[in-house]
Curated annotation (Swiss-Prot):
Belongs to the succinylarginine dihydrolase family. The lineage of its organism: Bacteria, Pseudomonadati, Pseudomonadota, Betaproteobacteria, Burkholderiales. It holds the Pfam family AstB. GO terms for molecular function: N-succinylarginine dihydrolase activity. The gene is astB. It is an enzyme of class 3 (hydrolase). This is N-succinylarginine dihydrolase. It catalyses: N(2)-succinyl-L-arginine + 2 H2O + 2 H(+) = N(2)-succinyl-L-ornithine + 2 NH4(+) + CO2. Homodimer. Gene3D superfamilies: Succinylarginine dihydrolase. Substrate binds at residues 19-28, 110, 137-138, 213, 251, 364.
Length: 446
């Protein structure tokens, strides 16, 4: 059946700030307490969506979550009117207010793991929201994520939106940032590839400096839940040493699309066994795996982390060639820029490189791949998606004007204590749900 890959990008929320909440994420820690520009952040992400839509790619948008999360702050014991809750948290536990105010849901690669209908036992598209239990500011996202996905993919005959896995370290799940899918054509059955950082119940190497956020057990549970074929499901462990170098998700060191895996030579434990397993599984489906392995001598792991070379989008153009979408930081690193020039000039599947300014997101450790959730949809499934979430000229203009109307152009950590920020955000989100036709999505609307 004819199918295409759609990308659903997260719209950056009004509370975008740099609180340094993500240990193991080098960029996040490096920019802690600096001033952010929520308006610029949202516009940078929106421009990427529009330009990719203009190139012919299916591009949707996911709305921000309500922040600050008054639910979290009240669960932590702060009481009174909303303004009182924020004031008390700012005075007594500013780190908790920062966690409750994070706009990290913008990185929708962590929103969920998605399996297309061609791979699942019941022939539906399956979504499992990630529990993100390794970080407080992200662990509060999954219920709102489930609600949003259920609103957009509402046809239960075609879509299955699950609850997140239990939020325990043994089942730590970071979503599609540690998952990709290989296939000959998007509508054909494929091989689903899960990458984990550690196993709870198996002995094996683990990082020693930064935590491994994804477990083997979580990846396996998602695959079982989605009804994937065992022979078309491959698990691999990410190299502990690259996690310790700041590769907190696999999409910082590898990206895949259709029959192509683009990765660093140090990405995986026992890499040849990984390549062999993928090759055999994909070969059984009549396709051939292309591995583009970047050697350390060309691009070091440090350069990869600093530029986010692999946190790129790998997209198939109408002519069958592949387009690599990278952040502008890749052109600011001489080694990475030279590698990209050679890559595009070569005879491999990647012939086109597009550069985007995503500076505001990048300063928090999120490149092009972090900002999007990939969903393969056939024609009937696409027709069942809520129509107002697809980016085109009209929606782009509406969202651009909405950002201008509601977003601040400067936000410091101290500004999170401003009770007006909550009201500004709620007013903005209330209007956004009308633009996107999603109904009463947020707690404050119910």
């Amino acid at each position: 059946m004819n199918a295409k890959e759609a990308n659903f990008d997260g719209l950056v929320g009004p509370t975008h700030n740099y609180a340094g909440l993500s240990f193991g994420n080098v960029a996040s820690l490096s920019n802690e307490k600096s001033d952010a520009n929520p308006k610029a952040a949202a516009k940078q992400g929106l421009r990427k969506m529009k330009q990719l839509a203009d190139l012919g790619f299916a591009q949707g948008v996911l709305p921000p979550q309500e922040r600050p999360s008054l639910r979290l702050l009240r669960e932590l014991g702060f009481s009174g009117k909303d303004a009182d809750v924020i004031a008390k948290a700012a005075k007594q536990a500013p780190e908790m207010l920062a966690a409750a105010s994070s706009a990290s849901a913008m990185w929708t690669a962590n929103a969920a793991t998605v399996s297309p209908s061609a791979d699942t036992s019941d022939g539906r598209v399956h979504f499992t929201p990630a529990n993100l239990c390794s970080k407080l500011h992200r662990a509060i996202e999954h219920e709102s994520t489930r609600r949003t996905l259920a609103a957009i993919f509402a046809d239960e005959a075609r879509f299955a939106v699950h609850d997140a896995l239990p939020g325990t370290p043994a089942l730590g799940d970071e979503g599609a940032a540690n998952h990709t899918r290989f296939c000959s054509e998007y509508g054909a059955p494929g091989v689903e590839f899960f990458v984990y950082g550690r196993a709870e119940y198996r002995r094996g190497p683990e990082p020693t400096r930064f935590p491994a956020r994804q477990t083997f057990e979580a990846s396996r549970a998602v695959a079982q839940r989605h009804g994937l074929r065992e022979e078309a499901t491959i698990y691999a462990q990410q190299s502990p040493d690259v996690i310790d170098a700041g590769v907190f998700h696999n999409d910082v060191i590898a990206v895949g699309n259709r029959d192509t895996l683009f990765c660093h030579e140090r990405a995986f434990v026992d890499k040849q066994a990984v390549y062999d397993a993928l090759t055999a599984s994909l070969g059984a489906l009549g396709a051939r795996l292309n591995v583009i392995e970047v050697p350390e001598r060309a691009v070091s792991v440090a350069d990869a982390v600093g530029s986010y070379l692999f946190n790129s989008q790998l997209l198939t153009r109408e002519d069958g060639r592949q387009l690599l979408v990278v952040p502008q930081e890749c052109r600011e690193n001489a080694n990475v820029s030279a590698y990209l020039d050679a890559l595009a000039a070569g005879n491999g599947p990647i012939r086109d490189v597009r550069v985007f300014d995503l500076r505001e997101s990048m300063k928090n450790g999120g490149g092009p791949a972090c900002l999007r959730l990939r969903v393969v949809l056939n024609d009937a499934e696409r027709a069942a998606v809520k129509p107002n979430v697809w980016i085109g000229d009209a929606l782009f203009a509406s969202l651009d004007a909405w950002i201008d109307k509601h977003y601040r152009d400067r936000l410091s950590p101290a500004d999170l204590a401003d009770p007006a920020l909550l009201e500004e955000s709620r007013t903005a989100l209330d209007e956004l749900t009308q633009i996107l036709g999603l109904g009463s999505l947020y707690d404050f609307q119910r």
